[in-house]
Amino acid sequence: MLYKDLKDSIKSLGFLSIEDFVQYIGVTPSDILEWEEKDEVPYTVSLIIHLLKGDRDLPNNKSLDSLVEECLPLAELLEEASSFPYKLEEMFLLQKELNDSTNGKNWELGRNKFGKEINWLRCIHMEVAELIDSTPWKHWKNINSEPDMNNIHVELVDIWHFLMSYILQETNVPRAVSLVNTHCIYEASEDIDVKAMVKEAEKLSYIALAIETGNIPSFGGIERFIDQFFRCCKISGLSFTWLQKLYIGKNCLNKFRQDHGYKEGTYIKTWNGSEDNVIMVSVLENMENVSFDELYSKLEENYPSN
């Protein structure tokens, strides 16, 4: 939304000047200067105009109508975000259950049931490297190849798996949900800038290293970690909704494999010509809202009997 369009539109709302409008919505003069310099106005202002338009009987105005159309995706996102706290709680509880099962009780103290040290920060660092390796960053081979966006999204889910574990090591589930909730409201990019995506992913490693070396306090670094992670998701085109679906999917498929003989070697990984993870993603794509139990049941329906 352009600043000059805003000036035209607010007149249709009954405001005499831009100053009257910004005073009404409670922004500062420095905000206005920034909008004017960039000739761009934040999305939230478009949303306010949309709400005001609904309150008044207004004449037709092309600029105003275009602003309303622009802000509708945000309005839809905000409506969808009402379910995010529940989805976050489900993911954190599933992650805690998984960690309790694989690492034993009291894994939050930094050691698993075998006495092995747990280092979630190093896990994140390694997954970031795998994400970057899914892009054509190498100057010595495959220089013209395309980034594997599907695998990049999977790697982001793996990073999320370890980031949630790190957060749970430092705090409890309700506090974890509260910390994350405001960060996961964003619009995923449609045009992916691969170089920018790699740079944003590398910052996750920098934060992990800064915490590990004591340059950032452990708990204080969590907010920066969360913010940077969702920046990576946004620039990589991974919406929170799809992140949640993929996380539930991977968690559910791992449980399904264990329940059907994965450790014993009797598990069937290819289902009617397709690998189980491909089937899992196709099932997710047809589910508007995903829950662990519902997905598990659908995997049961698709699993070959022999």
Q: Model-predicted segments: where are they?
A:
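Short alpha-helical DNA-recognition segment
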Residues: 15-34
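Residue-level detector of alpha-helical secondary structure
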Residues: 7, 36, 49, 53, ...
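DNA major-groove recognition helix of helix-turn-helix/homeodomain DNA-binding modules
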Residues: 40-61
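Short acidic alpha-helix initiation/capping motifs at coil-to-helix transition points
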Residues: 12, 27, 221-225
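A short, Lys/Arg-rich alpha-helix, primarily the initiator
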Residues: 1-14, 77-80
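Secretory-pathway ectodomains
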Residues: 3-10, 24-27, 51-55
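Flexible "arm" and connector segments at domain edges
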Residues: 76-306
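Short, charged recognition helix plus adjacent turn
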Residues: 56-80
